[in-house]
Amino acid sequence: MGFVDYIEKPELAERYRKVRKHFYLRESAYDVTSACQLRCEGCYYFQGDKYSMTDQRDPEAWRSFFVSEKERGITYVVLAGAEPAVVPKILRACYETIPLGSIASNGLKRIDPDVGYRLHLSVWGDSTGDPVYRKYANGRPGPNCLPAQLQNYKNDKRVIFVYTFNHENAAQLDEVLERVSDAGHKLSFNVFSQPSAGTSPLQIREMLNRTMEKMIEAMEEYPETVIYSYYNAEVHTDAKSLHHLFGCPYPRARLAEGTVPTGLSKTFRSYRTDLSYKESSNCCVPDTDCADCRHYAAGSAIVSSRFPMHVDSERKFRAWLDYVDTYLATWLIDYERGENLYTYNDFVAARQERRDSLLSGAREAAVL
């Protein structure tokens, strides 16, 4: 059986048509400011040399720049940096030029409601953990950001909270989920991925299985709140990184491998605050160690682009449909995620097959 056979099933055909409508999205990423109230442990912005650029602060210069990006074919923008909320005029200039996109924010400063982008509000832990992982710029323990986030964005449909798992905060999710759910918001997951410098103590490798269990527990306890799938949990907590499991379509990886750019690797750019970019850092999270990459933003492009790797069985195709459906619900306002097509039983079966394969490989190696 193959793809043509799979889409003869109504539920698979319907889901495929639903996600295919959004295949026109062509993204790039933009650091819009080097200013931030916080210094978070393992923050990717303050890695490498990009934070040392001189900021372009003129909103009209940004407006002209986004016009050129639109002409280049970009239809979706990811605005980040240090903290985008501190440059509201630049956000407005972008939104008025390219109206589809998202903003990564700590949520401490409200973004103008007229800027209709998806807002990804970062959460690093509960009321005890968040101040430990996120300090003020002067080094003092930071705030527990969640109360301020909930107050700033009450009843704001633009918002999705993104909880980043690290090596010690799985249990802290309970408090966060209860508060986010009570406020009527949605939440998705990220997995801490080591920066290239390899200096963060938050690396998660020894806690991947516990993280996966917590993800699934949350999905099943808060199905109306958590935007995630079993396949998301499977691939983002695998012992192998996304790069090792699927390869990577981003220009940074293609350049390192010396392969011919196609698709995303031809168009994606990661711009710095001075409107410059470098091929060697054209990636959604440029200063991540590829060998440890489990980042949710990276997966949105990596897994979604690997359609051919997911059509050799119906189960894999169902998993891929769930993943793309989840990614679209995470990154687009008003996109409603459907029911899981790749069930918990599918997830368990896939993990057992993986274990059996690894065991078989180990036995063969022992014989040799």
PLM features: residue spans?
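Local cysteine-cluster metal-coordination motifs and their immediate loop/turn environment
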Residues: 35-47, 247, 285-299
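Short loop/turn motifs at secondary-structure junctions
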Residues: 39, 73, 115, 183-188, ...
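Flexible loop residues that form catalytic
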Residues: 48, 82, 124, 192, ...
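Radical SAM enzyme [4Fe-4S]-AdoMet core and its adjacent flexible, acidic
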Residues: 92, 117, 121-278, 282, ...
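Flexible mid-to-C-terminal extensions adjoining Fe-S/redox cofactors in radical SAM and related proteins
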Residues: 260-368
